[in-house]
Amino acid sequence: MTLRSIVIKSGGHRLDTSLIKKPAEINEYLASLKKETCDFATYVLCSICNSIIQKHQVQSKAKISCRKVLSCPDQSSAGGLGHKNWEPSGALILPSTKQMGAEGSPVKSRSLFCQTNHNHLVNMDPMVSNDNNQQREGEQVGAMVGDSSPEDSPSGKHWNVRKGSGLVDPQTSCIRQILLLQLELIEQQQKHLHNKNKEIEDLKAEKEMLMARIERMEHRLQMVKKDGVVSRPSQTTCHKEPEAETTTSDDVQHSGGRVQTPKQTQRGRGVKGSKGKFLLQDSPTGRSRRGQPRSPPTSQQESPALKEDMQCHSKEVPYLTTTEMYLSHWQTPPSPQRDPSTVHENTVEVPSWRESILEPLGQKEASDILECLDDSVFLKRHSKLELDEKRRKRWDIQRIREQRMFQRLQQRMNRRKVIQESEPELLSFHAEPEDVEYIMVTPFLPVVAFGSPLPNLKQQDFDLPWLDERSRCQPEVTKKRTPRRRCRK
């Protein structure tokens, strides 16, 4: 189908007369235009309808094949009968039922290609009319072919499931978030409980350690009390003895004072340094010092309880201990050579002063002073200074550049070579007073050598670690020596 084109020819001076036409000709021209537009619309709609029908046929065939595969044998026969009753795509059958309006009122039946009202089609936009016609034709063709509704078909069910899953997704995400929060809370509580259990175990261990210490202290106090009860009657008998015996005992005490005097001084130092924070234990030596003069320390008069306590303590402690006091130098004593001696000087040399009296010069007026202030004189006077200043600036710039270059080179060297920090030199084995952690008041002193306690070694035979018992048991095999052969002459 082709559209007609009208060419208006120029009529010269008869333009006005040619434009004016009769009303009958105008009506005929309008009628022909309406017919042409209607024919064009019907052609376009027919082509659109045929394309839609072909698409629906392809879709229906695919659906039927899926149903045949998925349905039972009883349903497949029914589907085949229904397929036979279908009509060809060329013939279009309009529905016999009347179209109803929005409120149930019947609507005038319209033809498939909307040919009832030609004036309405002329006034409407062709693109809008084509879209509306396509939608209506698609619905009618679906009804004519006899396809099931999209909700009844499996694809429709899948679409409904998708819609439902879209609604469920936010709910599942919320539930997941709640579960994650609950899991995090459970993990935090487990960590908190684990830390609390650790603290409880540490406290239990500290409690057991303190209980063991308290038991040891109680045991020592009981032993000391027993020793005190035994020593009191011996002290009363010493009073009744004659004065000669007391003098001999005093002499013995003076002889043994060399060992006991450092004990008194060290005990006094410990009490002074502790500032009343630590309590002194009631030892037998302290009680004898408070009361009457004690008997001379001999091996026969030592109580068996003290020996047992010594043995128990030596077994518990991994280092050697003694009850005898000994002198230990924490620091080297000041020698007389190192003492700074003051230099005594009899005379101090002082420079001699003399007074020189200078009289001021006479005041002269400015007019009397002859000074040349010409430009040439002024420039000569300041040219040397300017040159010196420029030279200094040049030198300063050069020095700054050299310093920057030196710094860059030094940084490169530091990056390549890592400077190893030298460890401080060990000057003495003795610990410094700043490193003291705690003070222990006890009658047993550790045997210290070079600032560290000596280990408590068990009494056993000397053995070499690389010799086994088997090698010891094997007897030594003496090798036979053959006599030397002498050469015969």
Curated annotation (Swiss-Prot):
Domain of life: Eukaryota
Region called Disordered, residue ranges: 126-164, 224-311
SMART domains, A to Z: PEHE
Classification via Gene3D superfamilies: 1.20.5.170, 6.10.250.2000
Disulfide bonds: none
Subcellular location(s) per record: Nucleus; Nucleus, Nucleoplasm; Nucleus speckle
Coiled coil residues, start to end: 179-227
PEHE domain location: 347-466
Keywords: Chromatin regulator, Coiled coil, Nucleus
Entries under InterPro entries matching the protein: Msl-1, MSL1_dimer, PEHE_dom
Pfam families, per database record: MSL1_dimer (PF16801), PEHE (PF15275)
A biological-process GO annotation: chromatin remodeling
UniProt motif Bipartite nuclear localization signal: location: 380-394
Region called Interaction with KAT8 HAT domain, residue ranges: 371-389
Main localization (coarse): nucleus
CC per GO annotation: MSL complex; nuclear speck; nucleoplasm; nucleus
Oligomer status and interactors: Component of a multisubunit histone acetyltransferase complex (MSL). Interacts (via PEHE domain) with KAT8 (via HAT domain) and MSL3 (via MRG domain); both interactions are direct.
Similarity remark: Belongs to the msl-1 family.
Function text: Component of histone acetyltransferase complex. Within MSL complex, promotes ubiquitination of histone H2B.
Protein name: Male-specific lethal 1-like 1
Source organism of the structure: Danio rerio (Zebrafish)
